[in-house]
Amino acid sequence: MSRTLVLVRHGQSEWNLKNLFTGWRDPGLTEQGHAEAKAAGQRLKAAGLKFDIAYTSALSRAQVTCQHILDELGQPGLETIRDQALNERDYGDLSGLNKDDARAKWGEEQVHIWRRSYDVPPPGGESLKDTGARVWPYYLHTIQPHVLREETVLVAAHGNSLRALIMALDGLTPEQILKQELNTGVPIIYRLNADSTVASKEILSA
């Protein structure tokens, strides 16, 4: 038995492809995104993993990614909890805008600050710090107890909600986490110690 947590960012979405701010909007996966999600499941299967429970967000791109992974593992009916606590960072007034159009409207420097600062939210939206303030407590109270019971847990979510988890798990500073890119459909496998600290981390890239 092992205390195993697997994090996967959803496969490429239609809006990733169009370079739009997505946030809590709900576009579907591209053909490539479906393939990325299935490939993630295949890599997890090759690694010999089976899950006891899965968590995902309230957004379909993460839910479909989660389902593809479970299908590839032969676990299509596994208990899966969907919760908006794991949703992507809310980009507020930027949601649905092309990133170049946003730069034209607010200026390149301001948009860069909204995208790449830790604690400055866009109008009507969340900063990465705000995102972490909902994601990390949900992890501690809901997900981590399963892992510490020596279960294997899947979390299929989003770039920034997963960044918030990785920042806390890895003990990173805001500056360090902002430099971390999470590729779509690439599983990250954490093994935890009994005291909830990280024993090992492995990235299952193609």
Swiss-Prot record:
<dbReference type="GO" id="GO:0006096">
    <property type="term" value="P:glycolytic process"/>
</dbReference>
<keyword id="KW-0324">Glycolysis</keyword>
<comment type="subunit">
    <text>Homodimer.</text>
</comment>
<comment type="function">
    <text>Catalyzes the interconversion of 2-phosphoglycerate and 3-phosphoglycerate.</text>
</comment>
<feature type="binding site">
    <location>
        <begin position="22"/>
        <end position="23"/>
    </location>
    <ligand>
        <name>substrate</name>
    </ligand>
</feature>
<feature type="binding site">
    <location>
        <position position="99"/>
    </location>
    <ligand>
        <name>substrate</name>
    </ligand>
</feature>
<feature type="binding site">
    <location>
        <begin position="9"/>
        <end position="16"/>
    </location>
    <ligand>
        <name>substrate</name>
    </ligand>
</feature>
<feature type="binding site">
    <location>
        <position position="61"/>
    </location>
    <ligand>
        <name>substrate</name>
    </ligand>
</feature>
<protein>
    <recommendedName>
        <fullName>2,3-bisphosphoglycerate-dependent phosphoglycerate mutase</fullName>
        <ecNumber>5.4.2.11</ecNumber>
    </recommendedName>
</protein>
<comment type="pathway">
    <text>Carbohydrate degradation; glycolysis; pyruvate from D-glyceraldehyde 3-phosphate: step 3/5.</text>
</comment>
<dbReference type="InterPro" id="IPR001345">
    <property type="entry name" value="PG/BPGM_mutase_AS"/>
</dbReference>
<feature type="site" description="Transition state stabilizer">
    <location>
        <position position="158"/>
    </location>
</feature>
<feature type="binding site">
    <location>
        <begin position="88"/>
        <end position="91"/>
    </location>
    <ligand>
        <name>substrate</name>
    </ligand>
</feature>
<feature type="active site" description="Tele-phosphohistidine intermediate">
    <location>
        <position position="10"/>
    </location>
</feature>
<comment type="similarity">
    <text>Belongs to the phosphoglycerate mutase family. BPG-dependent PGAM subfamily.</text>
</comment>
<dbReference type="GO" id="GO:0006094">
    <property type="term" value="P:gluconeogenesis"/>
</dbReference>
<feature type="binding site">
    <location>
        <begin position="159"/>
        <end position="160"/>
    </location>
    <ligand>
        <name>substrate</name>
    </ligand>
</feature>
<keyword id="KW-0312">Gluconeogenesis</keyword>
<dbReference type="InterPro" id="IPR029033">
    <property type="entry name" value="His_PPase_superfam"/>
</dbReference>
<dbReference type="InterPro" id="IPR013078">
    <property type="entry name" value="His_Pase_superF_clade-1"/>
</dbReference>
<dbReference type="InterPro" id="IPR005952">
    <property type="entry name" value="Phosphogly_mut1"/>
</dbReference>
<dbReference type="Pfam" id="PF00300">
    <property type="entry name" value="His_Phos_1"/>
</dbReference>
<feature type="binding site">
    <location>
        <begin position="115"/>
        <end position="116"/>
    </location>
    <ligand>
        <name>substrate</name>
    </ligand>
</feature>
<keyword id="KW-0413">Isomerase</keyword>
<feature type="active site" description="Proton donor/acceptor">
    <location>
        <position position="88"/>
    </location>
</feature>
<dbReference type="GO" id="GO:0004619">
    <property type="term" value="F:phosphoglycerate mutase activity"/>
</dbReference>
